[in-house]
Amino acid sequence: MRRSRPHSFYVLSVLFGLFVLFLYGPMLCVYLLSFQGPTGGTSFPMRGVSLVWYQTLFEGGRGVGDLGNAFWRSMRMCVIVAAFSTVIAVAAGMAYRRKFMGSNFIFYTAIISMVVPGIFVGFGIALTLGLMGLKSDWWYSGVGSQLTWSLPFGLLIMFIVLGRFNPAYEEAATDLGATARQRFLYVILPIVLPGVIGITMAGFTSSYDESARSALNMGTGNTMPMELTALLGAATTPAMFAVGTLTTLFMFALVIGTLLLVGRIAKRRQLSLTRQQPA
């Protein structure tokens, strides 16, 4: 006989449903309003349904500013920040497998930027560059400011991944005569690769969304979030909603592609282990 659910289950279910509605309801409004008609505004009711604001976005029409250049600038920064975050996090994770002098100090120095307000970090970087007589530009001061946000997450992910790594695999490779380079490339890296991909994804997405730290360090160009913030103070059109919809689709595609890649890697590893088992 099936047991009836307690009343608390239904209460918690309603609360969870309200939370999901509160979280995703505004996003749904943004997606709907992006299909507003040519005479429509940035609020309901809908005045027709069309793709005119997507067309305006790609043709550089009214109310879209310099979104094209801002988008590609953000993409370049995302790739650079993700690459630096991945390489530094993996190197630091390998180094922290053994204790060394000053390891705790270096760790907390790297992590503390997560809790320091981003605007103060960005202001400190801009002030330091000014004292050195250097002008801000996206490719060094902008990237550096965003690394103070993305790198701590990469470090924490890598420490967790390597903390679960079984050293017996590395010891077996050593017994078979593998060098340090071979152990890393053919034993350690394939096992921790899903975590490394996670670090790359975290670095990419955190860089794309970051604006507080890089606002004072971008030089003459804006990133996508900065350009959108600037446009919100001007005459706002549903083109902003079209940008939000396309950005969401792009990020979903990126996440799904990453999950498929990680799943394929895990499947190949499982097949490799199955073939190595004795009959």
Regions found by a protein language model. Name each.
Residues 44-45, 104, 119-150, 181, ...:
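Membrane-interfacial helix termini and adjacent extracytoplasmic/periplasmic loops
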Residues 1-7, 79-110, 123, 127-131, ...:
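Transmembrane-helix boundary motif in ABC transporter permease subunits
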